[in-house]
Amino acid sequence: MTITLQDVAGILGLPTDGTVVIGSTSEDWHAACAAVFGHVPEAGEFHHSGDLRISFLDRHYTRWTDHEGNHAAEIYFTKAHIALMLGTWLLADKSGGSNFGCRLVPLLGGGFEEIGRFSWGSAVLTHLFRNLCEVTDARRSDMGGCHILLQIWAWIRFPPIAPPLPPHHPEPGTHYGCRFNVVQKFKPHEVTHYRATLDTLCR
């Protein structure tokens, strides 16, 4: 049993077919950021790994009202928030969402329809699998990837470890993962409880 593309589509609502997500590794990142976000990062806003610090996006795109009414600025703002979602949630690295991979910047350079044609679901699943493999190294203490996908998948596939949920009455067009938006209180650090429950499932 493992996470599949069907799970990604059902839980997150991301497309799992379309244009393959392949990022460039040789770009003028200052120019690429200027074209996509409308601002050029300062020297300190690049991580030593070459990735862009999320603080760059926070500095320029925190409040929608600062850009409302300016069509070009609204496009920059929206693309910045797509980048934030990718860098801190869907394709997060082990920095805990502090950095955004520059190789993804050119993928946001087209129109929104073009951006929507990428197979983001496939990229998210591939990225998560890679991080799950890497974290098996005993020297690693952190993990990148879409943790919320992994967590909701585990709750769905192993109901005994899931928090209590009210009856599900989905809104038209919403994906399955939305039903977990109502979860307010659960104990995430009960390691002993989860181990005992999983041991019981395996018997």
Question: Model-predicted segments: where are they?
Answer:
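Structural stabilizers in ordered domains
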Residues: 1-203
